[in-house]
Amino acid sequence: MTIEQDVKNWLADECVFREKAADENADFHFVIEFPKDNVMDVVKPKEKDVIVIGCATQVAPEHISLMQNASPQEKNKFLFDVSTNLNLFLVDYELKVDQDTLQQYVVTDNIYEDGLTKDALFKTIKRVFKAKLHCIMLLNYDFGNLNNNNSKPHNENSMFV
């Protein structure tokens, strides 16, 4: 079997495989749901010996508004807390910030082919998800929990699609 077949089978076995995405820059690109309703990507870039697991998250407009109204000190502390906490997960990340307000963040981690096993794949998927979830918890802690009837969850969190 090929790496692509192995990875797809492992994802399907655990009922997280959603679809294969067209991606001219990748040998394969799978969109997964882990956990249910949380979109993530599993990608093998062309001519690389690595699998990238990633999750992008768009910050809810309500949180953006609350951040925009926060003091500069509160914004800076929040961004510092997000960065230091993400570093504890040993993941890579990119914060998209406009005027000291977090707009979006992308969390990724890699598995090199020589370390690719089903166990390594799912531990990495879980680590990326937990890092994303931690950012959501920090947002809710610092700027309020938006889980009410007037707020719809935002699931615009696919890294590439």
Question: Predicted segment positions?
Answer:
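Short, well-structured hydrophobic secondary-structure segments
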Residues: 38-69
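Short, highly charged C-terminal tails/helix-capping segments
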Residues: 140-161
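Ampiphathic alpha-helical segments that act as solvent-exposed interaction surfaces
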Residues: 70-90, 113-146
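Short, internal acidic amphipathic alpha-helical interface segments
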Residues: 57-104
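Glycine-rich, often proline-containing surface loops adjacent to acidic residues and nearby aromatics
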Residues: 49-53, 100-113
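Solvent-exposed residues in well-ordered beta-strands and their adjoining turns
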Residues: 35, 56-58, 110-112
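Charge-rich, low-complexity N-terminal segments
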Residues: 1-50
